[in-house]
Amino acid sequence: MPLSVEQALANFSQRYVEAWKAQHDCLPINEELVGLASPCIEETRDLEISWQPIVRDEAIRLHNIEQGIELDLHDDFHAFYGTQYSADMTAKFEDMNIELLQVWSDEDLERLQGNMLGHLVMQRRLKLVPTLFVAVTDDEMEVVSICNQSGEVILDRVGTKNRTVLAANMAEFLNKLEPVIAA
């Protein structure tokens, strides 16, 4: 039986934390999130926090976006953003560096929903098939997204119809990711 998005995300998150520990002998550290509350925080030091992904007590669906744009969003999208809190995680997909976007806190979830709603409104105005971003790349004009119609994970050139299929679904995409830990 294939892995669910929830299982694949949990597996990648665990691989990421283990890779960080192997390289730095501690939990992941972040300097940019200091001062932002999150259930992920394990320890706060002067200019950095240590953190680890935390599974939500109950998975959520991002209905605010669906209601705002009057569009049912793909189940993989809800599973990806609605099952855990985490800092963003860097990874490699084949030869492409990405930063997997995550929800740090409930406040961050509100921000994500606003950004996603704006993204979908822009796509509707441009008459593009709706996509749901899940990661950024080194090229600020390209994002990794879930195609809302097919569920395929694609490399999406923002504001254009240029799209390249990366994986048949989100679970497959997550399973192919390799954690990248900065030195």
From Swiss-Prot:
Protein encoded by which gene: syd
Stated name of the protein: Protein Syd
Task performed by this protein: Interacts with the SecY protein in vivo. May bind preferentially to an uncomplexed state of SecY, thus functioning either as a chelating agent for excess SecY in the cell or as a regulatory factor that negatively controls the translocase function.
GO cellular component: cytoplasmic side of plasma membrane
Membership in a protein family: Belongs to the Syd family.
Subcellular location: Cell inner membrane
The entry's keywords: Cell inner membrane, Cell membrane, Membrane
InterPro entries reported for this sequence: Syd, Syd_sf
A Pfam family recorded for this sequence: Syd
Main location: membrane
Topological category with respect to the lipid bilayer: Peripheral membrane protein
Organism: Aliivibrio fischeri (strain ATCC 700601 / ES114) (Vibrio fischeri)
